A protein has these predicted regions:
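Core catalytic alpha/beta fold that binds nucleotide/phospho-ligands
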Residues: 1-124
């Protein structure tokens, strides 16, 4: 049973500009240390960051909440699963909200093409 659905799309240039403007401050605010290390290994780090950003925003939207709840995007970590699929792990406020809603996992799809990265998340 689906508890919540979220979709997000972002331009690669938006993420590139944020990295160029705020640098490590932006990276540390949005991405976990593991995600940052993984991005360095990617053939297109900007696209990788953009997909992760879209994924985190899509997951955020599955909860139907606002930022006043105190959530942080670093409370969502997206790693590669056994078959390369994006596998999110939630901690902090996100983990508490997930438990309160009776959800057991988040299904996530990420993609990019040209100048756009897109994500769809389902809370189940």
């Amino acid at each position: 049973m689906s508890i919540g659905v979220g979709v997000d799309i972002v331009t690669l240039n938006r993420v590139k500009d944020a990295i160029e403007t705020a640098g490590q401050v932006f990276l540390d605010k949005v991405f976990t240390p593991w995600e940052q290390e993984r991005a360095k290994q990617h053939s297109n780090p900007t696209a990788y960051y953009a997909m992760l950003f879209a994924g985190k925003e899509a997951i955020f939207k599955t909860f139907g909440i606002g930022w006043e709840t105190g959530v942080k995007l670093t409370e969502i970590e997206i790693r590669d699963g056994n078959f390369g699929e994006p596998t999110p792990t939630l901690s902090g406020v996100f983990a508490e909200l997930m438990k309160a809603r009776g959800a057991t996992k988040v299904l996530l799809s990420l993609s990019y093409d040209g100048e756009y990265a897109i994500a769809m998340a389902t809370l189940v």
